A protein has these predicted regions:
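Amphipathic alpha-helical "coupling" segments that flank catalytic cores
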Residues: 1-682
């Protein structure tokens, strides 16, 4: 027998960006706690609005499943005497298990008792389960309220807890569970009761609460498209903004608004950013993809008095756009190049100087990278780009709308008559800005982005500002992942440790500290690269194999991992198995001197010939980081390796022959060592 379960946690408005995680936690927490309590169910669903988090469970068993187990006792020798009679040990064990000694069973030389624990009634367990689910929810920030000691994201106002038609009684923060919920703040008719979980979603809809986020999303998307079409345009659908709006409203109604066409003379970013990031409005474009002097927004309510709402939204946006127009006009009075000296007034970071100091370091780091990578970039280009890189941070537009850093830098650079690639690089230095964002694609943009991130990361580590746990105030994790993804995508082969060392020299870091700082940076980058490889689906054996070694060359490491994964040999078979067998034989042996006059078998000769052939071809493949070719060459020796190990006794009675065979294997293992530590595949 089973019943449906409902838990609704009623609160003050929860921040929109907390909601997806909270609903996911509630879903996973319920599944976990039901499993631990041996409670079967058909389905779990979580829904919610800014004022409520709800758990809906269908087919929850009315009783725990019985749990059977075997409790192990003393050995048979101790439990029974020579005549098979139970000893004091057996009787004591039986007594402790609350059974007669005759019920003991023997298995594997020990006595056991079969124990079955009858399941409890679900309704008796649910009050505690409900409280655990509520208290288990974690948020980036929480609060206390009134005289309560309990912390939660926002004050708790009501609980609905139903198992079937019965209320699950519990109390938290002086809020007692019941069946009464609340409708829309303005459209609803007050509190109302839920009689059973199955009516929850539909009954809330009648009171102007669209509790299912997916239903709200569909209403918003369809409504926005319909309004946009009616106004002769199409909506610029931003998924991040859409997700936020879904969790800002309980009953969505899309509407449009207008603004003066004069504002369209501003750079698009200066119009869209105040609209989207500050007002949560969606821009509109016409059939030729030009920005229109219109916007779409979503009201938390019905279509009553929409004109009044529209005018209010237009008035707020007009003030924002007036500010943007003023900032733009003021900024255009001075070129970016004329702002370079002003960078000396702005501290970049305590201990790392001003933005001017940073721009000087950027020039030095870009020059270093250019030389290492042998790129066709003039030193004058680098110096000029470094001078411009941070100057847009001094503009009023960026100081007001900080998310426009780089974006307005590109716009202003183009208006100043800078080369397009230089302007693009000013923008690209901040890429990627988030997971999945685009990467720089111009040479100057790649150099500046890497230099900027390398400088910030290395400088922070030199000051001991290393991310720990959830604390990462300077976004070093994101920047590290950005560096690695840029290097991998560009295929630029450079040892990051060398970059760290150079930057520490430029910073003037104490020489006695540098080695430790580089080691910390190396380990930090290795861990981030490991995560990237895992996310890309690489087998953990391959990851461990290629991450061994002193060099932190991300592009080269990924090439090695890809070559191992994509070779015609299976990860667990042939090539890797063959070389792993060699590694297990060699262990820590170092000598690779082979005397072919000591060979006694054809297998030795064949392996030596295969080894020489590979040694002739591999250096060229390794020199150009062509690991696909290298793996193919290594594969040609597999047959000879297996024949040798299957048919030749390495530990020969003659010391010279034994050592020579071991040296041959050591030399064979050396063929694959540039690819990775094959012992990690054991």
């Amino acid at each position: 027998m089973s019943k449906d379960l409902l838990l609704e946690i009623g609160t003050e408005e929860i921040p929109a960006h907390y909601m997806p995680s909270a609903l996911k936690q509630l879903h996973e927490g319920a599944a976990d706690i039901f499993a631990k309590n041996h409670l079967d169910y058909k389905d779990i669903r979580t829904v919610g609005t800014p004022r409520r988090l709800a758990l809906l469970v269908t087919g929850l068993a009315e009783k725990q499943a019985d749990v059977s187990s075997k409790n192990k006792g003393p050995s048979v020798k101790i439990a029974f005497d020579a005549d098979g009679n139970p000893t004091q040990a057996a009787m004591g064990f039986a007594r402790g298990q609350h059974i007669d000694v005759s019920e003991l069973v023997t298995e594997d030389g020990y006595v056991y008792v079969d124990v079955t624990v009858a399941g409890s009634e679900t309704k008796a367990l649910l009050p505690e389960i409900m409280k655990k689910l509520v208290s288990s929810l974690a948020f980036p920030k929480s609060m206390t309220w009134g005289n309560e000691d309990m912390r939660f994201v926002r004050p708790l106002r009501w609980f609905v807890a139903l198992f079937g038609t019965e209320v699950v009684p519990f109390e938290m923060a002086h809020v007692v569970s019941g069946r009464t919920t609340r409708g829309h703040r303005f459209l609803g008719t007050g509190d109302f009761d839920i009689q059973a979980p199955g009516e929850y979603v539909d009954l809330l809809r009648e009171h102007y609460i669209i509790v299912d986020p997916e239903e709200r999303r569909d209403m918003i998307v369809n409504g926005l498209h319909a309004v946009a079409k009616k106004q002769g345009g199409h909506v610029v659908m931003d998924e991040e903004l859409l997700e936020e709006v879904v969790y800002l409203v309980e009953y969505p109604t899309p509407l449009y608004g207008c603004f003066d066409t004069d504002y369209l003379e501003l750079p698009e970013a200066a119009v869209i950013t105040p609209m989207k990031d500050h007002q949560r409005y969606f821009p509109l474009r016409d059939s030729e993809d030009r920005l229109m002097n219109m916007f779409l927004t979503v009201r938390n309510g019905d279509d009553y008095h929409l004109d009044t709402v529209r005018h209010g939204n237009e008035r707020v946006l007009r003030a924002r756009l007036d500010d943007a127009k003023f900032f733009f006009a003021e900024d255009r009075k001075k070129s970016l190049a004329d702002r370079t000296e002003d960078l000396k007034r702005i501290v970049f970071q305590d201990g790392l100087g001003t933005l001017f100091d940073k721009s000087q370091r950027l020039a030095a780091i870009m020059t270093f990278l250019t030389a290492k990578l042998d790129l066709p970039v003039e030193e004058g280009e680098i110096k000029h780009l470094a001078d411009l890189a941070k100057t847009d941070l001094l503009t009023q537009m960026v100081q007001e709308f900080t998310e426009l850093q780089g974006v307005m830098g590109r716009e202003y650079a183009l208006l100043d008559g800078e080369e397009p690639e230089t302007a693009e690089a000013v923008f690209e230095q901040y890429l990627p800005r988030f997971a999945g964002d685009e990467l720089p694609h111009t040479t100057l943009g790649l150099l500046l982005s890497l230099a900027d991130k390398f400088d910030t990361i290395t400088g922070s580590f030199s000051l001991g500002l290393i991310p720990t746990g959830s604390q990462d105030p300077f976004a070093l994790r994101r920047q590290t992942i950005g560096v690695l993804n840029i290097l991998i995508d560009a295929g630029w082969n450079i040892n990051c440790d060398e970059v760290f060392a150079y930057i520490l020299e430029v910073l003037g870091t104490d020489r006695n500290k540098r080695e430790d700082v580089i080691a910390s940076l190396h380990d930090y980058f290795v861990l981030r690269l490991k995560n990237i490889l895992q996310d890309a689906g690489f087998d953990y054996h391959i990851i461990d194999c290629v991450l061994q070694g002193d060099s932190m060359n991300a592009a080269e490491i990924v090439k090695r991992a890809t070559a191992l994964r994509d070779s015609e040999f299976s990860t667990q078979e042939e090539l890797l198995q063959a070389y792993t067998r060699v590694a297990n034989m060699v262990k820590d042996a170092q000598n690779t001197d082979v005397d072919d006059t000591l060979f006694e078998t054809e297998e030795e000769k064949a392996l030596y010939a295969a080894c020489l052939a590979a040694e002739a071809e591999l250096p060229q493949a390794y020199a150009v980081y062509d690991y696909r070719c290298a793996v193919e060459i290594l594969g040609r020796a597999v047959s000879a390796i297996n024949n040798f190990l299957d048919n030749v006794l390495v530990m020969h009675e003659k010391e010279a022959v034994k050592n020579n065979r071991m040296n041959l294997l050591t030399r064979t293992l050396g063929l694959i060592s540039p690819v990775g530590d094959i012992k990690k595949l054991s």
